[in-house]
C-alpha cells in the first residue's frame, strides 16, 4: 500500500458491461509504465483482489484510469461504486512494463476489454517513433471501446466485429494474417484480449519467424508477489508467475491449453459468488420495501 486514498473521481460506462473509472492514486500514477497493472480491493469487508491493467495515467494530476468488464462479484461491486466513494486498496504498479523501443512496424491487436491495456502500449510505441497498426475486435458495434483514442495516433486502424455491424465482419486474426504477409510486415505483434483470441493470434503469427509475438496474460491473482501461486503459467518448459514475471510473455512459449484449463476451473466458484451477491441484494431490497 502507498498512502493514496483511491477516491473514484470519474465514472464512465463505455458499453453495457464495460466501465472506466478515474482514481486518485498519485504514487501509482508517478511510477506506472505501459503494460503494468494494479491489484484492486473494492471493499474492506470483502477482501478479494482483482488484477486490472492501468489504461492511462496522469502523474501531474495524480490519477490512474482503470477499464474493467462486469463479469464477477468484485467487478460488479466496482461498477456499483459511485463517484466520490473510495476503493479499499490499490496495490501497484505491478508486473514488468513493456519494453518500449523504436521498432520498424508494430501491430497491436486488442479484443474486447483487452483494448484497454493495449491502448497505452500502442501509444507508447507510437511516441517512440514506431509505425503502429491497431486492430480492434468486438462482438458488435455497441461493444467497441476507445476507438477515438486509438485512431488519434494509429498509422493504420482496422476494426472487426463478429456481426459486421461496424468495420469488417471478421475475426482479428484475418487482418493480422494479411498484415504479416505484406512486404512491409511488422517486426512485432502485441495481442491482448481473451485467452482464446491470444492463442489464435499467436498461431497466426507463428509461421512468420521474423515477427515477434507478445501476449499479456490476465490470470487469477491473490497477493501480487508470486507467493500464492495462483497466477502460475507454463512458459516453455518452466513455471512462471504472471504477477512478477509478466504479464507479458512470448506467445510462442505459452502453454495455452493448460492455462485455459486452469481459468475454466475457477468459473463455477465465481458464478456461486455472483449468485450469493444477487440473493443478498434482492433480500436487502425486499427488506427496504417492507420498511416503507
Model-found features: residue ranges?
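Short, Lys/Arg- and Gly-enriched loop/turn segments at beta-strand edges
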Residues: 46-54, 94-101, 243
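Ferredoxin-reductase
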Residues: 2-85
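Structural signal for conserved beta-strand scaffold positions within catalytic alpha/beta enzyme cores
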Residues: 10, 56, 159-161, 215, ...
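Short Fe-S-cluster ligation motifs
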Residues: 244-245, 249-292
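FNR/FR-type flavoprotein reductase catalytic core
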Residues: 73-222
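A generic structural signal for residues embedded in beta-strands
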Residues: 40, 89-90, 233
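Local cysteine-cluster metal-coordination motifs and their immediate loop/turn environment
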Residues: 117, 195-196, 218-248, 277-281
Amino acid at each position: 500500500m502507498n498512502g493514496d486514498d483511491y477516491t473514484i473521481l470519474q465514472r464512465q460506462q463505455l458499453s453495457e458491461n464495460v466501465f472506466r473509472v478515474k482514481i486518485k492514486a498519485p504514487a501509482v500514477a508517478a511510477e506506472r509504465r505501459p503494460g503494468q497493472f494494479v491489484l484492486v480491493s473494492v471493499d474492506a469487508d470483502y477482501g478479494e483482489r482483482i488484477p486490472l491493467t492501468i489504461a492511462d495515467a496522469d502523474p501531474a494530476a495524480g490519477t490512474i484510469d482503470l477499464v474493467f468488464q462486469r463479469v464477477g462479484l468484485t467487478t460488479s461491486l466496482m461498477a456499483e461504486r459511485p463517484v466520490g466513494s473510495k476503493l479499499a486498496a490499490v496495490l501497484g504498479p505491478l508486473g514488468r512494463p513493456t519494453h518500449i523501443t523504436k521498432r520498424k512496424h508494430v501491430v497491436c491487436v486488442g479484443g474486447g476489454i483487452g483494448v484497454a491495456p493495449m491502448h497505452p502500449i500502442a501509444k507508447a510505441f507510437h511516441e517512440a517513433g514506431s509505425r503502429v497498426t491497431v486492430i480492434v475486435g468486438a462482438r458488435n458495434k455497441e461493444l467497441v471501446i476507445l476507438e477515438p483514442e486509438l485512431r488519434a495516433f494509429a498509422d493504420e486502424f482496422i476494426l472487426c466485429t463478429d456481426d459486421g455491424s461496424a468495420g469488417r465482419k471478421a475475426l482479428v486474426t484475418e487482418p493480422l494474417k494479411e498484415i504479416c504477409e505484406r512486404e512491409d510486415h511488422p517486426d512485432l505483434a502485441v495481442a491482448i484480449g481473451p485467452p482464446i483470441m491470444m492463442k489464435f493470434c499467436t498461431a497466426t503469427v507463428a509461421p512468420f519467424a521474423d515477427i515477434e509475438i507478445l501476449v499479456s496474460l490476465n490470470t487469477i491473482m491473490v497477493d501480487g508477489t508470486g507467493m500464492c501461486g495462483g497466477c502460475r503459467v507454463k512458459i516453455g518448459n518452466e513455471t512462471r508467475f504472471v504477477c512478477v514475471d509478466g504479464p507479458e510473455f512470448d506467445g510462442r512459449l505459452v502453454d495455452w491449453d493448460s492455462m485455459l484449463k486452469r481459468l475454466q476451473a475457477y468459473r463455477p466458484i465465481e458464478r456461486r459468488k455472483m449468485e450469493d451477491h444477487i440473493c443478498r441484494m434482492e433480500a436487502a431490497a425486499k427488506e427496504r420495501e417492507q420498511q416503507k
